[in-house]
Structures are given as structure tokens and as C-alpha cells.
Amino acid sequence: MTDKAAQAVRLFTSESVTEGHPDKICDAISDAILDALLEEDPDAHVAVETLVTTGQVHVVGEVRTSGYVEIPQIVRKTLVEIGFTSSDVGFDGHTCGVNVAIGEQSQEIGAGVDASTEVRSGTFEDDDQYGAGDQGLMFGYATNETPEFMPLPISTAHHLSRRLTHVRKEGIVPSLRPDGKTQVTFAYDENDVPTRLETIVISTQHDPEVTQEWLAEQLRTHVVEWVVNDADLSQYYTEDTELLINPSGSFILGGPMGDAGLTGRKIIVDTYGGMARHGGGAFSGKDPSKVDRSAAYAMRWVAKNIVAAGLADRAEVQVAYAIGRAKPVGLYVETFGTAHEGLSDADIQAAVNKVFDLRPAAIIRELDLQRPIYRQTAAYGHFGRTDVELPWEDTSRADDLRRAAGL
């Protein structure tokens, strides 16, 4: 650790992985299947899990739909798009085995979603029809550390991973293979403001003939320095920033041949890089009737609008549901002492209740979630994306929140 690191109040680290990481392959396949089913049937109920290992892809889960899709074809297409096109790179989407074991959604779960507790008790209103697909708690978070209202560490890690994939696919850095990871450590001061980029770690799969010295120079120039300029990180990136590229040495064997992968095993990468709490539910392969996904998106929507409205510098929002019930059983707002203009967290929570309807049917309608938009979220994060447009990143409710808070 450097002297400067020792003087920092805290060091905070976040990681990202590329789309060729085994777990992210699984997320991509599950979301590609989900998108294909939603294209056929917007009301489809989908819960699809994927496992990859050497030469094999296994797809399992539960589905209720009037549509039909060719799952093996979707699996192979997704693998080829990622870059697994030959056994030489550790996996071949053209020839791998694909095993599918998908059953019908439980009728009891389906009944609770289709007719909520409120409907069955005769006390329902508009948007009370659909109950939550499961119990659970979901968090959303936003901060003014970056223009996209995301924590700087996870934003930077994703930026590096996206660039690493770009230079591979475009041939800017030849001899790279799909699997890869990035990690960044930032120093924060006593006011929780990032001050320095302390360490960058990049591990990337590559062809056998590559030397680590050549690879380090290429990635320093075409990935690290490019991202520093593109993301305007020069105030954090200094001559003291430690750069570790493939610190364990060669990385030839990767992808599913190196490690088995599963859907839903990168939930911190998918969200806020550990800067905020997580309810535990994964996203990929789940249709929006599953509040694990839709309510987590809604919480990001709420938190981002709180910060965009200038009500706080940071906001974390929790919501909770009971299976089969439309109305949330809990809502909580935390601003970590950063609320503005004399507001309390309770004031902001009251404003949120006035502006946002957090029943599942309302979330699905307001964010237009019954459409094939999920494959693009399977890698590089579900939040704060600058490369794709996602409805939960909209901040048009900021003015409504200010009015509801009396500002």
C-alpha cells in the first residue's frame, strides 16, 4: 500500500467482468431466451436458468407462454455473438451440447400473480390486479459522484470491461479472447468524496503466443488510458496509480473450459459494485412479473430521481413485497445525512409515496417492461448505462419529487 493510500480515510473497490466470463455467458443466454419469449408473448412468465461447463450448456426453468422459440438456436447464436466460435478459445457455440429442461410455471404461483390478494378479497383498485411474483426486498441506489448518478468505482470498472471487449472485437488489440475481469480501487476522503484511483486490475484471456509485457503495454494504451480520457478520470489517475495486468501470469484457458458458469452469480457486478445493499435476488432470465427484477429497476428509478431532483447527494431506497399481494409491505429511504434544503429522510419518503406507484402492475406499465430489452443488460451492469437507453434511468420525475417535497 502506498503512503497516500495509508492516509486515505478509506479505500473502496468494485469489479466488473466481460461478457465472456462464464457467469455472464449464462446471464446473456437466459436474457436472450427471455427476450425471444417476450417478442412472441409480452405476457409470458419466464424463469430461465443457464449452466455452462466444458462443451455443454444446460438450460432449465419454468415458463408459461403462448409463444414458442427455438432455445438451442438462441443459445448458439448468443455464444457466437460473445466470441466463443472455436474450441481453440475454449468453447465453440456451433458444436457444443445444448440440453433443455424447461417445465410449466407452478399454477399456484401463477394464480397469485394473475389475481392478487386484493382481487381475491374484493378490495382491489386499478393496478391492484397483479400480485408480486414472490416475497422479497429490493434496493435501489444513486449518488452524484458521476454524471450517470452511479458510484465511481463500479462505473469505472464497467467502462474498462466494455472497452476491453471493444478492443477485442474490433481487433484493436489482437490475440485477445472473450473471458476477462476488471477491478478498481478508489481512495475516499473524510467527506466520502473520491480523491484518487489507487489500483486498476485487468485480467484478460489471450492467445498462447502473447507475451505479458506486450499485453500490458497494449492494454495500458488502448484500454486504461483510453477510458481515463473518455470518462474524464485524469484527476484521479496519476503516476502513483498501480496498474496490474494479468497479475497471475498467462490466462489462456478461460470461459466455460476454465470455470463453470451459472445465471445470477454476479449480482454485485450487476448493481452498484458493493456500494449499496442488495436484496439477494438476481435479474437475468426473469420476466417483469418477478419483483426481484422489476422492483429493483423501480428502486433505481426512484433513487436516481431523488438525487437528480437535488433532494440528496446519495439515496438508497428499499421496497418489500409479499407474494400474491400488489401493494408493497414496506418502503424505506436512506440518504446517509446528505438530504438537502432542510429535508429529512421521512420527508423524501413521503414525496416518493406521492410520486411513484410501486405496485407491480404500475411498475411494469410505467417502465414498459413487457418488451425484449433485457439481453443488453446481461453484461456491464443494469444501472447507469451510457451505451444503451433503459427506462429506469429516466429522471423526468425529478420535478414532481421537488414539488411533492414542497420545494
Swiss-Prot record:
<feature type="binding site" description="in other chain">
    <location>
        <begin position="265"/>
        <end position="266"/>
    </location>
    <ligand>
        <name>ATP</name>
    </ligand>
</feature>
<dbReference type="GO" id="GO:0006730">
    <property type="term" value="P:one-carbon metabolic process"/>
</dbReference>
<dbReference type="InterPro" id="IPR022629">
    <property type="entry name" value="S-AdoMet_synt_central"/>
</dbReference>
<keyword id="KW-0630">Potassium</keyword>
<comment type="subunit">
    <text>Homotetramer; dimer of dimers.</text>
</comment>
<feature type="binding site">
    <location>
        <position position="259"/>
    </location>
    <ligand>
        <name>L-methionine</name>
    </ligand>
</feature>
<dbReference type="InterPro" id="IPR022630">
    <property type="entry name" value="S-AdoMet_synt_C"/>
</dbReference>
<feature type="binding site" description="in other chain">
    <location>
        <position position="105"/>
    </location>
    <ligand>
        <name>L-methionine</name>
    </ligand>
</feature>
<dbReference type="InterPro" id="IPR022636">
    <property type="entry name" value="S-AdoMet_synthetase_sfam"/>
</dbReference>
<feature type="binding site">
    <location>
        <position position="282"/>
    </location>
    <ligand>
        <name>ATP</name>
    </ligand>
</feature>
<dbReference type="InterPro" id="IPR022628">
    <property type="entry name" value="S-AdoMet_synt_N"/>
</dbReference>
<feature type="binding site">
    <location>
        <position position="259"/>
    </location>
    <ligand>
        <name>ATP</name>
    </ligand>
</feature>
<protein>
    <recommendedName>
        <fullName>S-adenosylmethionine synthase</fullName>
        <ecNumber>2.5.1.6</ecNumber>
    </recommendedName>
</protein>
<feature type="binding site">
    <location>
        <position position="23"/>
    </location>
    <ligand>
        <name>Mg(2+)</name>
    </ligand>
</feature>
<comment type="pathway">
    <text>Amino-acid biosynthesis; S-adenosyl-L-methionine biosynthesis; S-adenosyl-L-methionine from L-methionine: step 1/1.</text>
</comment>
<feature type="binding site">
    <location>
        <position position="286"/>
    </location>
    <ligand>
        <name>ATP</name>
    </ligand>
</feature>
<keyword id="KW-0460">Magnesium</keyword>
<feature type="binding site" description="in other chain">
    <location>
        <begin position="179"/>
        <end position="181"/>
    </location>
    <ligand>
        <name>ATP</name>
    </ligand>
</feature>
<dbReference type="GO" id="GO:0000287">
    <property type="term" value="F:magnesium ion binding"/>
</dbReference>
<feature type="binding site" description="in other chain">
    <location>
        <position position="290"/>
    </location>
    <ligand>
        <name>L-methionine</name>
    </ligand>
</feature>
<keyword id="KW-0808">Transferase</keyword>
<keyword id="KW-0547">Nucleotide-binding</keyword>
<dbReference type="Pfam" id="PF02772">
    <property type="entry name" value="S-AdoMet_synt_M"/>
</dbReference>
<comment type="similarity">
    <text>Belongs to the AdoMet synthase family.</text>
</comment>
<dbReference type="GO" id="GO:0006556">
    <property type="term" value="P:S-adenosylmethionine biosynthetic process"/>
</dbReference>
<dbReference type="Pfam" id="PF00438">
    <property type="entry name" value="S-AdoMet_synt_N"/>
</dbReference>
<dbReference type="GO" id="GO:0005737">
    <property type="term" value="C:cytoplasm"/>
</dbReference>
<keyword id="KW-0479">Metal-binding</keyword>
<comment type="function">
    <text>Catalyzes the formation of S-adenosylmethionine (AdoMet) from methionine and ATP. The overall synthetic reaction is composed of two sequential steps, AdoMet formation and the subsequent tripolyphosphate hydrolysis which occurs prior to release of AdoMet from the enzyme.</text>
</comment>
<keyword id="KW-0554">One-carbon metabolism</keyword>
<feature type="binding site">
    <location>
        <position position="49"/>
    </location>
    <ligand>
        <name>K(+)</name>
    </ligand>
</feature>
<feature type="binding site" description="in other chain">
    <location>
        <position position="21"/>
    </location>
    <ligand>
        <name>ATP</name>
    </ligand>
</feature>
<dbReference type="GO" id="GO:0004478">
    <property type="term" value="F:methionine adenosyltransferase activity"/>
</dbReference>
<dbReference type="InterPro" id="IPR002133">
    <property type="entry name" value="S-AdoMet_synthetase"/>
</dbReference>
<dbReference type="GO" id="GO:0005524">
    <property type="term" value="F:ATP binding"/>
</dbReference>
<feature type="region of interest" description="Flexible loop">
    <location>
        <begin position="105"/>
        <end position="115"/>
    </location>
</feature>
<dbReference type="Pfam" id="PF02773">
    <property type="entry name" value="S-AdoMet_synt_C"/>
</dbReference>
<keyword id="KW-0963">Cytoplasm</keyword>
<feature type="binding site" description="in other chain">
    <location>
        <position position="62"/>
    </location>
    <ligand>
        <name>L-methionine</name>
    </ligand>
</feature>
<dbReference type="InterPro" id="IPR022631">
    <property type="entry name" value="ADOMET_SYNTHASE_CS"/>
</dbReference>
<keyword id="KW-0067">ATP-binding</keyword>
